[in-house]
Amino acid sequence: AGYAAGIVRPSFGSTSVDYDFKPFGNLRLIHITDTHAQLDPMYFREPNFNLGVGSNRNMPPHIIGKKLLDYYSIDSTLLKHAYTHLEFNKHARKYGKFGGYTHLKTLIDLLKSQVNNNALLLDGGDTWQGSGLSYLENGRDMVEASNLLGVDVMTGHWEFTFGEKIFLDNLKIFNGDFVAQNISLTEEALFEGLEPIDEDNHFQNPYIIKIINGSRVAVIGQSFPYT
């Protein structure tokens, strides 16, 4: 949600997007995902083809274009551009680029300040991998970017493609907590001496309990698929 909110140019967003959300409840959950190591704003086009298999066919998240708009009853031109490929060139000229970590940081800090910092910033992964720089830096640059954003808890997706050693090295400099309930060590990994987190042989903690504004909040990690 935080990433989608950054799709507009400052001139458009300053007059057309209201970020003055009234606080409710004990805390605020802020979620970002799939920034793919893109630190600068960029043009992004949703796919015009997505094929679900079996019972997932023609079901979210495997519906696109007009089917998606009809399924969720979306008639906003802005959301149409954010979530589909329809009339991309036309709307891209109007709304500008997506994302950008400076934009994200500004928005996240605003959303936190509205609730006296009683908030958790969650990251669904696909964050540390995806750019030429992150490839050269083995994702370390993006770990540092995550720390600057103030990510509290994240799970993984393409972060694992750097390999076990680099991934674990990156976790050492990550200031947040990494959780993944669906990743366990294989017999081969155990034989080679890699230590599991618990008796169920989890690679990392499956969940974590955070105490925010007097409330206990459980965050369960679900790595790919369906992060």
Which ranges hold each PLM region?
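N-terminal catalytic scaffold of extracellular/periplasmic and nuclease hydrolases
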Residues: 4-227
